[in-house]
Amino acid sequence: RQVPARAAGPDVWSGKVTDPQVQAKAALLVDRKTGAVIYALNEHDELYPASLTKIMTCLLVLEAIDEGRLKLSQEVTATPTALEGLAEDGSTAGIEAGEILTVEELLYCLMVVSANEAGAILAEKISGSVDSFVDRMNARAEELGCENTHFMNPHGYHDSLHYTSAWDLYLITKAALEHPMFMTVCDAASHTVPATNMSEERTLNNTNFLIRSGREYYNPDVHGVKTGSHSQAGNCLVTTAQHASMDLLCVILGADRTQDEKGIWWTYSFVYTDKLYNWAFDNFSYQVILKEDDAAGEAPVSLSSTDHVTLRPAQAVELLLPKGADLEELEKTVVLKSDPVEAPITEGDVLGSMTVSLDGEELAEVDLLAFTSVEASRIRVLWRDVKEFFSTTAAKAALGVVLVLAAVLGGWKLLFSRRRYRYGRSVGGGGRRGAYRG
């Protein structure tokens, strides 16, 4: 297994690449291939996510489908209770009470046009009530390892107790991306909802301008995932981007929307996302640190005529590093499971691990395997077993008992022999005196 470790972007790459100068409340750029963090800004701060909340809502719907509790083709009727309390000026697909849509169409309404009512309708369908669904949202967040997240609703309406972090959103989105339907829905630039019992067909245009050709922010490398905004949250965005062999995920929270001197409004969640992707594509590349058949050190061996075994990585170690990075600067630390390693050893046995670091920050960890098998020496194993036996408390106690018994038996034997000697002298002397009569 290769276990990539988190690496704080700006700190690690300082002096090696230029700072992209992101002025949002939080930002995170992660390499999906290795899990390494390329850029991080306040990634654990608790912030309002607005409609990024719907990523979790969508995840729970897709999981319910996988579990057989729901079907994409299943029809759902919008109830008055689901629509209750939704603001008229919020993002909507215009779904009305009594209207019937399939789960699939509700997902498109939820993720493409960010319809708040779609989130509430799906929540009620899955859990029986919106409140019960929110409980499941929080439980699922905890299961995913989110430590700075608490939801109060399935759509992202502002509440002081409704918050998350850039890192937690990464964890939630990562889980959602395991479902192919998630990207199918959220990467749609537009979608046409067929006519329903209460509406003619309607066309939904994605709120993410980075994936809509013809928009000023359009970037063909960017795909999905979700926008979010309200006055307290600012402008928020989660996306992925693929370029050459790179596959990245970006989270922006709390970006501004400002008007320039020409009167043009700029939404900086789009601007910073595009900036971070281009910065990463221009400045980073994958570099092979260790090949699978490379020697990665040696481990001392005991109980064998061979005194060491060569180690190799369990798999190739490939890291996303600044272009032109000096690989000699990487620190490789080997930790063995035992030192020395006892024979017999089978080729492929996990004997330890290697951590790869840069400037004290861990970039990756990989298991180290035995390159070859090593046979044990029977004589050395026997001698080891003998020494171990006599070093145990039980063996020492047994030896002590044996010595005590030997001493007791020896004492009895000596005492018995002395008594026999005295008895013999007494009997012999009396006989002689009786025979002499003068």
Where are these regions (language model features)?
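Intrinsically disordered, low-complexity repeat and linker tracts
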Residues: 1-8, 297, 323
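Short, charged, intrinsically disordered terminal tails
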Residues: 8-21, 419-425, 430, 434-435
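Domain-terminus/edge residues, biased toward the C-terminal soluble/receptor-binding domains
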Residues: 146-150, 158-163, 167-405, 409-425, ...
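Active-site-adjacent loops and short helices of periplasmic peptidoglycan-processing enzymes
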Residues: 3-167, 171-180
